[in-house]
UniProtKB/Swiss-Prot annotation:
This is Tegument protein pp150. Residues 452-462 have a biased composition (Gly residues). Belongs to the herpesviridae large structural phosphoprotein family. Phosphorylated by host CCNA2. It comes from Human cytomegalovirus (strain Merlin). Residues 397-549, 659-945, 1006-1032 are annotated as: Disordered. It comes from the Viruses. One of its GO terms (molecular function) is structural molecule activity.
Amino acid sequence: MSLQFIGLQRRDVVALVNFLRHLTQKPDVDLEAHPKILKKCGEKRLHRRTVLFNELMLWLGYYRELRFHNPDLSSVLEEFEVRCAAVARRGYTYPFGDRGKARDHLAVLDRTEFDTDVRHDAEIVERALVSAVILAKMSVRETLVTAIGQTEPIAFVHLKDTEVQRIEENLEGVRRNMFCAKPLDLNLDRHANTALVNAVNKLVYTGRLIMNVRRSWEELERKCLARIQERCKLLVKELRMCLSFDSNYCRNILKHAVENGDSADTLLELLIEDFDIYVDSFPQSAHTFLGARSPSLEFDDDANLLSLGGGSAFSSVPKKHVPTQPLDGWSWIASPWKGHKPFRFEAHGSLAPAAEAHAARSAAVGYYDEEEKRRERQKRVDDEVVQREKQQLKAWEERQQNLQQRQQQPPPPTRKPGASRRLFGSSADEDDDDDDDDEKNIFTPIKKPGTSGKGAASGGGVSSIFSGLLSSGSQKPTSGPLNIPQQQQRHAAFSLVSPQVTKASPGRVRRDSAWDVRPLTETRGDLFSGDEDSDSSDGYPPNRQDPRFTDTLVDITDTETSAKPPVTTAYKFEQPTLTFGAGVNVPAGAGAAILTPTPVNPSTAPAPAPTPTFAGTQTPVNGNSPWAPTAPLPGDMNPANWPRERAWALKNPHLAYNPFRMPTTSTASQNTVSTTPRRPSTPRAAVTQTASRDAADEVWALRDQTAESPVEDSEEEDDDSSDTGSVVSLGHTTPSSDYNNDVISPPSQTPEQSTPSRIRKAKLSSPMTTTSTSQKPVLGKRVATPHASARAQTVTSTPVQGRLEKQVSGTPSTVPATLLQPQPASSKTTSSRNVTSGAGTSSASSARQPSASASVLSPTEDDVVSPATSPLSMLSSASPSPAKSAPPSPVKGRGSRVGVPSLKPTLGGKAVVGRPPSVPVSGSAPGRLSGSSRAASTTPTYPAVTTVYPPSSTAKSSVSNAPPVASPSILKPGASAALQSRRSTGIAAVGSPVKSTTGMKTVAFDLSSPQKSGTGPQPGSAGMGGAKTPSDAVQNILQKIEKIKNTEE
């Protein structure tokens, strides 16, 4: 709050303000001790009323500044109490002559303490000092004052006069300026005096310091209140004769009583707040032509002019208006202006023109001195300065207004508000801005990734992690069970999930979860799914179930066509899946069960079967675990009811490809035995590609589209992140070949172990055995999958021995529940580490162990689209003699990637997790499952689909237990080129539309030509001996299937 002065020049106002600002640094803080400051209130050149107002404003500001710097004597008072106690302690031990009188003064010192009222401080200090001085004089036997009504003066005892003078000067300085007490450099501990006298002298100095500060402060406070009240009374009397509204308004403000500091501050606030209302009642100059703001002055000024001028020009003024006596002791002749001339007026009270006023004043006064000229020049200079400052202020306000307007304007259209720079890769036009439409500039909740792929292909195959967030926020959803308002869509809660522990592996961390955006809700409904935000550009296909949050096997077939409730099977991971090369993922232990199924509907599921494990023990499934099954999806979430999602894979097959994998090359090929491997490894598989891409596209074009599943990234795991005791790597081979190499040289054994690395092609086999300890998997990055035009294949892993013919086996993605028979508890799979150093092979230590341990992989969403990653099961290729193994020779042809365990719906809308159940092979009991197979029950009930899988190289690995069932074929004529003229066995999975729990049957057939094979069809298979070419063999197979179908109907 700044002070307001009227009619003062700039330098005068600055002088007044600086005095108040540096008041505590002045030698004397009394305002009346600075007469020059009081004269700057306009005493010499302003109207008396204006001078009084400026003085009132100065005293109010001065009093406020004094109270703001009110000295705090708390520490000094505490010191005084301590010194009083010291004097009393020494006084009780001193041998006074008059013990009774001394005892009374000691009691005064003992009772010395200060209350909360500071007004009593000086009185308490004075009483204590008088008693202390009397005790000191009694100790030195000095004469005391004995007169009635007189008290002992407070003085120092036994000190030199020079020392006393220095002490008095210091105390006087404290009295003049109580805000700054200078320390006294004087030693009061004199050796000639006793301890009691020295303690009394110190107490006297401290007490007098307190008394000077308190009493000088009280004196200044009383003076300020008196001067403020005096100025207020004078101004009220000055304004009493005024008849204007502003004068009466100011007079009413001044009538507020000022009794203390709070009331003084209230008066100051009122005067400053309404300054613009009454300012015109105070003239700013003593002459009209020097800048008087008010043209109406009261008659008392006219009376004063009459008394001074004595001219005939004012003879017409009525006599009753002329005051005959001075008011309140004021002498109009000896006015406070001290010779300054008041305003000049006409007889009728109106202002005269400038020339007439100048002539009248010259005639009345008789002089026009140089001082008036100097003041006029100064006034003009001041006016110019004021005008220049006003112009600068106006220009500054305009600039500030322009800046505010520019800040309020919307941002330029070149950069969208919600646009963010891509973190992984750039767009096709080589700029950092997002290429989405205008409606995709608001962050909205992630929906379940499922609908058409219009925006999915806009990224050019790059899966931006934030592209899923950019969806339409300006339109309302048109589909789904609920339609929530637009405001709720825009303000939906989200949280960026940091690397966290997954359900599948509580002790390990997901590598890609740091960029995963999850809603803060428990489930993902269709709240935000609609036609306007139906694109899926986050790398996942448009499936109604997000594989990142789906951990159950759910039957999503149409419930109206099912005779019984669908079976929901939940699995839990027991072993990690390792990533090798270009995305070939196999379990970390060959011959071990990966998933444990738990049928939800016991009526439609087979009898409970023991869960095969490494050691042959049974691991029951806890129903309260987080892997418990969930209810079937509603109809609006069924992929069968969303035709746009089903066609997503055909339009956007490149989105299934992971562009962020970093291929590494390794030139070393080793096969060593290591007891503590750095990473669990699995044998590389021999792969075969048997058809052209054009034909394969026609074969696999109409397959259903599903979502991609999370896989486990063991490549980026740390050395200590995996259990080294669970899987022991006996050898790992990394090929050092080019991309199109056909044959890979056999591995050479060196005493050095190599770690898995990403390679684009894997075409070799290495021996491996596993221990009986299971591992927990780790969900990792999405695995890169090839283009949809690749060829379906089968991967088998067997120990390498001599030279035999190629052995490739395959199974359909879904097997009837009737073919899944539990393995008896007596058949336990055991393993041991048996390595032959010379040949690089491993043999089974038990006769019941399968000769070749294979890992069964389930199809991923990319596998359904791409034949190169079709859902194939690496069944155990059991030979007739368990003691011998059938090692395959190196396979020719380009290698490809294999499917990975999945958590999403697959063929025909059936959700399959992990590997599909294996099929009993020849050489094993019908009711037995090998250690590498999985016990699970599924209920496929969907429209009939005929799927021809790649052939197997041996007839013994074919399936011949299921009765043949015919079904309409969906193969086109061009699909005949998909099969090569090789001696192999294929499996046809036939889906039946009948309402039964076993709607899928398997038909095995032999594709071998009689001219090349030299033998007839294998037992238990559909012989196609009459076919001369592979195309004829396919046609014969389809005709036989049609015939069987018609017969069944």
